[in-house]
């Protein structure tokens, strides 16, 4: 009773929502464009091009004819992606992850002309600061601009746990997602532990199963419990985690977001792939019933792994016949260089501000 009352108080007088589970086939969209709002790399003079049916648009400097530039895109070790999808006359927009700092996120979405008032959903892939650090500032900057009761999708209560970074070469406090800020912004916190629809165009994978050779590294630990409203409620965690003070992060709460593109297959936004990019793809396939993968974009979390492991991942991606592979964030230079040699026609380069437009067959 006390727990329920506390949750109701923190979440605007109602219990957290449950996402709409997938019943039958997933929606099919005619077009989806993915804009990298925040990432680690920037190259202002990269030339746009078309690779097969994929239109690649780089932002450049955003120059105008009448006045000199006063700012530019900000890159940092964080990730945020904006997705716009079309199905017939319908258009849907979502923002997945929020970068490391609000300065980068708010600056970049302004320059990239991403309109927060048009967002139909927010998705947080997992509870690491480099994916939610810009959220509070984004919500404060756009107070009153977002749609009423805007859904905020998460993969479970673990998203709210306070974390310590323990992976070399650094250690320290890695922050916590503040649920009270979400309540103040009048977001509808929506738990999507299982495969779920997002904005009736996209779907989340739900929690990602371990279906391949891939290993889960644990660069962070989770503190179990709530202190002054910050943290995760033990009652909402898996049974084996409830009585522990701190536990290695296994990222059971991590999820990916995907689209079923007409006549092409899945376009999968992986975020960070702590549970493996191959496992993430397999989870999206299982969630949707669609086996063909047109593109996978996001962090693949291969930077910490040895070359042999990276090669094994590339071999698996080739075996799965993914049309296009777009590494971001934590994928690592070793992966990029090896993939460039092993699958040069499938590997696409991205920078902060790059937009990938995927057209359905027959468009």
Tell me what each language-model feature is.
Residues 68-77, 85-121, 136-137, 144, ...:
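Pre-active-site segment of Zn-dependent metallo-hydrolases
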Residues 82-84, 197, 258-260, 357:
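Short, well-ordered beta-strand micro-motif
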Residues 83, 97, 109, 126, ...:
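Divalent metal-coordination and catalytic microenvironments
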Residues 96, 198-207, 267-270:
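Short hydrophobic-aromatic micro-motifs
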Residues 115, 189-198:
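Short acidic low-complexity segments
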Residues 120, 125-193, 206-217, 318-324:
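Active-site HxH/HxHxD metal-binding segment of metal-dependent hydrolases
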Residues 121, 128-132, 151, 236-356:
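Cap/insert and terminal regions of metallo-dependent hydrolase folds
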């Amino acid at each position: 009773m006390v727990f329920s009352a506390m949750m109701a108080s923190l979440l605007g007088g109602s219990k957290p929502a449950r996402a709409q589970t997938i019943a039958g086939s997933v929606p099919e969209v005619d077009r989806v464009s993915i804009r990298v709002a925040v990432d680690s790399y920037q190259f202002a003079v990269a030339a746009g091009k078309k690779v097969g049916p994929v239109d690649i648009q780089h932002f450049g400097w955003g120059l105008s004819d009448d006045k000199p530039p006063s700012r530019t895109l900000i890159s940092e070790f964080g990730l945020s992606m904006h997705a716009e999808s079309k199905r017939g006359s319908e258009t849907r927009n979502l923002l997945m992850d929020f970068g490391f700092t609000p300065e980068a996120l708010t600056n970049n979405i302004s320059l990239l002309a991403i309109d927060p008032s048009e967002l139909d959903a927010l998705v947080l892939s997992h509870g690491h600061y480099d994916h939610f650090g810009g959220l509070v500032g984004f919500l404060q900057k756009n107070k009153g601009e977002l749609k009423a009761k805007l859904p905020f999708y998460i993969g479970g209560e673990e998203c709210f746990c306070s974390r310590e970074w323990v992976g070399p070469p650094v250690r320290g406090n890695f922050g916590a997602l503040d649920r009270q800020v979400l309540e103040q912004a009048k977001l509808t916190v929506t738990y999507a532990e299982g495969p779920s629809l997002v904005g009736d165009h996209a779907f989340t994978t739900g929690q990602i199963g371990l279906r391949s050779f891939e290993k889960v590294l644990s660069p962070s630990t989770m503190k179990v419990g709530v202190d002054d409203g910050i943290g995760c409620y033990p009652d909402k965690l898996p049974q084996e985690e409830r009585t522990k003070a701190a536990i290695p992060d296994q990222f059971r709460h991590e999820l990916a977001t995907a689209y079923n593109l007409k006549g092409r297959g899945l376009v999968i936004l992986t975020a960070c792939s702590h549970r493996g990019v191959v496992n993430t793809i397999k989870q999206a396939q299982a969630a949707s019933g669609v086996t063909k993968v047109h593109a996978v974009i996001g962090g693949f979390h291969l930077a910490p792994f040895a070359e042999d492991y990276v090669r094994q991942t590339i071999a698996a991606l080739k075996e799965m016949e993914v049309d296009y592979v777009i590494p971001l964030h934590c994928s690592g230079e070793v992966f990029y260089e090896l993939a460039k040699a092993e699958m040069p026609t499938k590997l696409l380069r991205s920078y902060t501000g790059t937009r990938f437009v995927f057209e359905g067959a027959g468009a």
